[in-house]
Amino acid sequence: FGGYPWFYKKELYSLDSFPWIRDIDQRLELLNENIKKLNIKEYVQSKYYQSLNEIDYLDQSFYDTNKRKMIYLNIEWFMQTLLTRSDSQSMYNAVELRVPFASKEIVEYMYNVPWTYMFKDQQEKAVLRDAFKDFLPQEIYNRKKNPYPKTHSPFFLTYIKNLLLETLNDKNNIL
């Protein structure tokens, strides 16, 4: 539905790589030297170009072509990661997760909806908003998209820091 910033921020959709991993050099610094030798950056870039070659571009403007590119990359890469994580986390906790907007039929339909319908009046998710306009209160209908809730827990932060330090001190670990 076009809610992520790389759909509407030119500095993100104009990048010559996956926009959600634009800080790859910083991430690679976390890995140990043996893993760094694997040329991960080049591998990621080659997957990006391979994905671009898989896209069926329509006779569209440059602007719409970029949007189609972002939608395709989002479906094939970013959303796959989110769905895999959600699925494994829910299964671990014996919870059956439903993701109705990720159904094959909806995804295929939305892939072909022109961007002007998806991002209308400077507001993301326009198709979804319009579909539910008569059912939602105005304050929800007009609410800006916000990411999944984040919580702050000092106990959890301390736990994760200690776990990371333990992992980093393990010489057999790839980090």
Regions found by a protein language model. Give the residues of each.
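Active-site donor/metal-binding and catalytic loop motifs
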Residues: 1-6, 147, 151
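A mobile, often basic/glycine-rich helix-loop segment
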Residues: 2-28
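Adenosyl-5′-phosphate
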Residues: 20-175
